[in-house]
């Protein structure tokens, strides 16, 4: 029986990342070790590790102090004859330091899969993380922005590669031919006003109050919009109360959590624009996958890496962070688009996702970096 030569060590396997891990298993000679949950949040559902070909070990993520943690069982992978290690690039994981250092002594390749730098890191954090990244043979960052920051900070450009990020891109691509305009919003609201959609966790940090305030500003200037919030409100943010205070209680739909891909596709496709007033992450990829433009803030050091798939005027736009009036101004630009313009936006959105933010392009990068062509 052929022995796999690559070991992937990761903190956990969130359910939405099943497509990329399954594609790795299908395309590379790779074993997987996952933690049962993340140190920072235990609320994220993981996929069934037992269904992933190559899954070999369940690790235990043990908090040491602050954000630092240790993955019990990870070091044992050094005793096996792996030639390459694909690892979550998180400097807070102390066991990863040991593995990266030991692998270097053993002349084994290490590949760091990481967010990299955001641009807001403090001096000491920068120094520590730079030392961490320097130990790896290759670095995979989610976007060009982070890779450029690492290169400017002294990490050799030759070892930095952009990997992008993805959801279930193959499935989403196949679903596009079935997308249709429906009455999902008009039947709920009883009107045909434009729809501003938010999809993600309903949290204080997402600044959804700005979305309601922007809608109020638009209304005062004679433009009515409907607001739809898709996601679980575990922090009791109080969106209904916010809407009631400005007289928009009949213009808000708290849809709640939704994990049905067909329903989400319908919601995105029929919305006028997806708005993420706080940082945006994979929501941007999700929205663009179904042709829906994305609006988010312009302070990139406080953004998720997926902000990079927002191309101003093409696939979405940016507004001044924390500025509801500017958010209203940017939203207004998109409300007047003709059917032809919306069609062009959808084409641009699909091109952006199909070019970089998908499983196939990620696998191409993995194969190149890990030097496997099978």
Please place each PLM-identified region on the residue numbering.
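Conserved donor-binding/catalytic core segment of Leloir-type glycosyltransferases
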Residues: 7, 184-206, 212-215
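A short, histidine- and acid-enriched strand-loop-helix "catalytic/donor-clamping" loop
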Residues: 108-125, 135-138
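Donor nucleotide-sugar binding/catalytic pocket of nucleotide-sugar-dependent glycosyltransferases
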Residues: 134-183, 191
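Nucleotide-activated donor-binding/catalytic signature segment of Leloir-type glycosyltransferases, i.e.
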Residues: 230, 237-258
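Acidic donor-binding loop of glycosyltransferase active sites
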Residues: 266-279, 292-293
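Short hydrophobic beta-strand element within catalytic cores of glycosyltransferases
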Residues: 293-302, 317
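A charged, aromatic-enriched C-terminal amphipathic alpha-helix characteristic of glycosyltransferases
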Residues: 336-371
